[in-house]
Amino acid sequence: MDRRPSQYSSEEEDDEIEMYEHDYDGLLSKGKRHLGKTRWTREEDEKLKKLVEQNGTEEWKVIASFLPNRTDVQCQHRWQKVLNPELIKGPWTKEEDQRVIELVHKYGPKRWSVIAKHLKGRIGKQCRERWHNHLNPEVKKSSWTEEEDRTIYEAHKRLGNRWAEIAKLLPGRTDNAIKNHWNSTMRRKEEQEGYLQNSSKTNQHTIVTNFPKSNHLMTFTHTRASAEHSQASTSSFPYYHIAEHQNASYPVALRVNIVNVPQLATAPVQRHYNDEDPEKEKRIKELELLLMSTENEINQKQELLNHTASYTTCHSTTIGGNPRLHGQSTPDSCLGDPHHSTPSPQVDHSCLPEESASPARYFGVNLLIQMKNLAEYSETQLIDSFLNTSTQHENLEMEHQSLTSTPICASQKNTITTSLLRDHALRLQKENHLLRTPAIKRSILNSTPRTPTPFKNALAAQEFKHGPLKLLHHTPLHLAEDIQEVIKQETDESGIVHDHCNTEEPLLKRIKQEVESPTHKVGNLYFSSYWEGESLNAQLFRQQSTLDDTSNSILTSSLLMKPVSEKEDHIFKSFPVQSIKSYTSPLQHLSGTWDVMSCSRMEDQKILAEQYCKYIKNFSTLVI
């Protein structure tokens, strides 16, 4: 069996032979050619170590003869890159980096095996990767640009994963760096988001403007209107160029009232480099919807402004000294469309605060109107311009309507014209159905009063007549106290004589004992039948359903029909006859028929009526 010669050239590419560090149970990577190669097993590694100890590190052909299906080159690489105990796999030190730089200057950037011999514990592959990834001053370490991404995208469509060939098209970028950039960033964006697929279409529709870069800013000169305002020139709009490495941040642009003019050629790519926020795509879509709704609203307001009368102001003010006062807008060269212009009315800044009267902010509003005339524009820069102007424009529109309707002087703030009210009403009625919930008109809800329910009326009448209701716990102690308090109160009001109540046992206590005593219950049944026979045609109770009062009929009849003793008879006789009504419950005063049906006016039933009036109050609280 022929063996390959032992060739470990200093110029060889170590990536051609893949080595594995003790990953015995792993799988071979897909997409690579394996010429009869399999992973090294533990037995092969142990056997290789013993053979190296016996034969040294020079006789690789002899060592390979003891290992079936292994060549001398495979055995040599396995020992030098994996099994050699002198290998250093930790981080590089400053001394090692300095040594690599000196050796590369001496031997060149390709003789890595020779360079590795001067660095103990390092192999040629480690030295090569350290040089190209960290130490080579010619290798770019900056962020990837749009042109580089487009070059990689086009080359990858033609060459595939031939990174060495692609690296020749990008000076300053290594094949390893290009491969990592493609696998980590570009492939995902290209497959999921269609990154750079529409770049050719974008270049075809690019509109030539006066600005070769996207870093031009426009400033404004805020001057009062005078008789010489017709002689002003466009020099009031100077342009300032910012270098490529300088960028005006959003807070700075907001503070100095800067509006970024959109650059049309770099629309789909800039958001990829500005921020790596994963949620930025969602926010961009939301801003696009908000921008569309705002633009539609501004267009409708612009139509209303075209029909308004001439503007009368206390102190007329022009924007930036532009001589085109009526029917014209910002210079067409700013927006890249010299054929379309939108009228921009004069603005009375004397009625507004100094900050809100900035002409740059008003220009930002006009910028959104001009965007509809552009064939294509930069999404990122338009969003920046929208962020700088939309919020302040909405605040001005809510608080100071002089920008969207007839200006009002300081002396005329209290007198709002009909046109202002009409414009304000139209703005309030328009709702954005995409991003905002439609407002509920409270005037419709509150136009008619709500009719209170009869239950609320009854409660109100009860509280007005007897005071607020009190909720008490239903305990026997509280019920006894409440009954005594009610009896005492009604006794004081009706002039009841209660001399015997102080000397003898309370009537309520004795009644309770009689009810709880089983002997009295039997006696009450007997006396109940006796009294029912005595009262011939007397109607003691109101005609009600027997199903409602079945559980209490025996108790009430036994209590009310019991013969009255001499002492009780003396107490009852001391009550005036006209005070019978006062023993009814306060709730019973609501119905006058209750007294007629329940308390008879006959002489032979006065005692029974008095007893009934006393016990009917405790009807729902007595327990059988």
From Swiss-Prot:
Protein's name according to its UniProt entry: Transcriptional activator Myb
Record-level Gene Ontology MF annotations: DNA-binding transcription factor activity, RNA polymerase II-specific; RNA polymerase II cis-regulatory region sequence-specific DNA binding
Entry note about domains: Comprised of 3 domains; an N-terminal DNA-binding domain, a centrally located transcriptional activation domain and a C-terminal domain involved in transcriptional repression.
Pfam families membership: Cmyb_C, LMSTEN, Myb_DNA-binding
DNA-binding region(s) from the entry: 60-83, 112-135, 163-186
Residue ranges, annotated region (Transcriptional activation domain): 264-314
Function: Transcriptional activator; DNA-binding protein that specifically recognize the sequence 5'-YAAC[GT]G-3'. Plays an important role in the control of proliferation and differentiation of hematopoietic progenitor cells.
Keywords: Activator, DNA-binding, Nucleus, Repeat, Transcription, Transcription regulation
Region (Disordered): 319-352
Record-level GO BP terms: mitotic cell cycle; positive regulation of transcription by RNA polymerase II
Annotated GO CC locations: nucleus
Compartment(s) of residence: Nucleus
Annotated stretches, region: Negative regulatory domain: 315-449
Annotated ranges, domain HTH myb-type: 32-83, 84-139, 140-190
CDD domains (UniProt xref): SANT (cd00167)
Record gene name: myb
